[in-house]
């Protein structure tokens, strides 16, 4: 009788190795499914934050043009520090130093000060094709020009 109660207590304690392996496998499968979706959601959030910052910079340039009757003239691939000297703090408190991926802005204006373009090279940080319109490429350049997006992320990103 004493042996029966000892054997029962030993079998009632804890999980078996097989049960633990099954649980670890299930957690691994869930993680494998969730991580790519989480990364995609984070990239989409960075795209939206970048677009919001581009609109804010564009608004500052519009306010600058109201006071000066022109956008800043002749900027070529300028970054945020060049623009900060022109628009902060009067038109914008601070110019974001770069896009949501920490890549620098590429800001251009024409020689007459009638057009501006703000470009983010996107997730990959490299200049890509600029076909215009919505694009499903997660690495696409985002281009904002004269208060409108010329190229932007749209739809399911790949």
Model-derived features with residue positions:
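Extracellular/periplasmic head regions of type IV pilus-like filament subunits
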Residues: 59-117, 158
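N-terminal leader/signal peptides at the extreme start of proteins
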Residues: 1-15
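Gly/Ser/Thr-rich helix-start
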Residues: 15, 29, 70, 103, ...
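Short, solvent-exposed loop/turn and secondary-structure capping segments
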Residues: 50, 67, 129-131
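Short, surface-exposed interaction loops/tails
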Residues: 2-4, 109-158
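Amphipathic alpha-helical segments typified by the pilin-like N-terminal helix
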Residues: 12-52
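N-terminal membrane-insertion helices
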Residues: 50-61
């Amino acid at each position: 009788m004493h042996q029966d109660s000892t054997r029962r207590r030993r079998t009632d304690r804890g999980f078996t190795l097989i049960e633990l392996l099954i649980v670890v496998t299930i957690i691994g499968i869930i993680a494998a499914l969730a991580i790519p979706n989480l990364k995609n959601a984070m990239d989409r959030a960075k795209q939206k934050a970048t677009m919001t910052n581009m609109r804010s910079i564009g608004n500052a340039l519009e306010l600058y043009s109201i006071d000066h009757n022109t956008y800043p003239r002749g900027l070529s691939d300028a970054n945020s520090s060049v623009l900060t000297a022109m628009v902060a703090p009067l038109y914008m408190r601070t110019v974001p130093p770069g896009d949501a991926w920490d890549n620098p802005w590429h800001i251009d204006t024409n020689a007459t000060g009638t057009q501006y373009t703000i470009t983010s090279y996107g997730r990959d940080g490299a200049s890509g094709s600029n076909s215009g319109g919505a694009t499903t490429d997660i690495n696409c350049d985002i281009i904002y020009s004269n208060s409108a997006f010329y190229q932007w992320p749209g739809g399911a990103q790949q």
